C-alpha cells in the first residue's frame, strides 16, 4: 500500500499547493493511497510509527516535505524490513533529494515513485543510514549529522526569519550560507579527542566542526565530503580544527567548490564508527534537526538499512 506523510508548512507553506499537484497525478492514474498531514514538530515520526503498525508487509512510505520531514519519517519507522521509503522534496535545502538525484518537479517525482513501486522489494535500491548517539539518546540520519558550526547553523535556521524571507524569494538555499558567516565569528570552539573505528584517539585543538556525511553535501548543497557514498558502508567525516576563524572564513568559497580537502586545518576521513570527546559542550544535529549540546558523541553507519523508491 502507498502512504504519504505531508508537511504542508514546508517551504513557507508552498508545499500545500505542491501536494495538490501530486494528488492530481495520483487521481489521473487511479492510484490507491492514504495521506496523512503532519501538524506539528515530531508528528511525522509518530505518523510513520502508526503506519508501520498496520497489517501491511509491503509499505511504500513517502515523505512530502523538506529534509527535516524526511528525517522524522525515517526515525519513526519501526520495521525497516517491510518499508520502502520515498521522498518528494518541498523544502528549502532538499539535500536528501539532491543526493538521491531525484527530480525537482513534484509531478515527475510522484511518477518516478509509482514506477519504482513496480520493482520487487529485493530489487529495490538500498542505502546506508547513520546513527548518532548523544547522552542517553540516539537519532538516525540520512544526509549528515555533526557537531560545532554546522550544527549551530541548523539550530539557528529553525527559528530564523532569514530563512522565511529567502524562501519567499526562492533563495532558501542561501539561508545556511548567511547563517554560517553570521555564526562563525561568535561561536566557541572546543578541543577534541577523536576515535575512528575504535583506533587510538587523535587530538584536535580548537575544533570548529565535524560533519558525519552519508551523502556528499548538506546545508543546501555544500559538498562537505565530495567523495562520500551512501552505499559503501561508511560515513565520511569532514573536520575543521586548529586554524583561526578568519582563515576558515576565507576558505568558505573553497568549501562550496569542493576544493577544501587539501587545505591545512581541513580533513576528510572515511570510517564506520567515530567517537568524539570534547573539552566543552557543542551543539549536535542530525539532518539539520537540533539535538542539544553534548561533550561526547558517537556516530556509526548502518549499511543498507533503508530501501529507497528511486
Task: List each model region and its residues.
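Short amphipathic alpha-helical segments
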Residues: 16-18, 73-77, 98-100, 155, ...
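ATP/NTP phosphate-donor binding region
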Residues: 1-61, 71, 75, 111-112
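ATP/nucleoside-binding phosphotransfer catalytic cores, i.e., glycine-rich phosphate-binding loops
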Residues: 15, 196-204, 223-310
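Catalytic core of DAGKc-family lipid kinases
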Residues: 29, 79-84, 90-208
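Glycine-rich beta-strand-to-loop/alpha-helix junction loops that act as flexible
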Residues: 8, 64-66, 88-90
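Short glycine/serine/threonine-rich phosphate/pyrophosphate-binding segments
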Residues: 44, 68-73, 95-96, 127
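Glycine-rich phosphate/pyrophosphate-binding beta-alpha loops
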Residues: 146, 150, 209-225
